[in-house]
Amino acid sequence: MRFTQAELQQFRDRTVPDLLPDPLRLLFIGINPGLWSAATGAHFARRGNRFYPALHRAGLTRHLIDASDGYKAEDLAELHARGIGISNLVPRASAPADGPTAEAL
């Protein structure tokens, strides 16, 4: 999946659904989703993001998750089975340079 900058801008202020499995064993909270994450519907989805490789290297996931094109069913199943949740402090997506305002935080 590829997006132009103009296409990504269409996802500004969109949200990415929280992942909150039951039982929840470990919760990661980001500041706010990026435009790529909003476009794909997956947390930490930008190509090159080290979040999922770090989870895998730490032994928290059995396989390496690549969320750059959105979550695959087996990726969501793995996160749920492991009790790994992901949410954001500010739900609305923005470009990194436009991060959330102090009021939003």
List PLM regions with ranges.
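A polyanion-binding, active-site-adjacent surface
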Residues: M1-L105
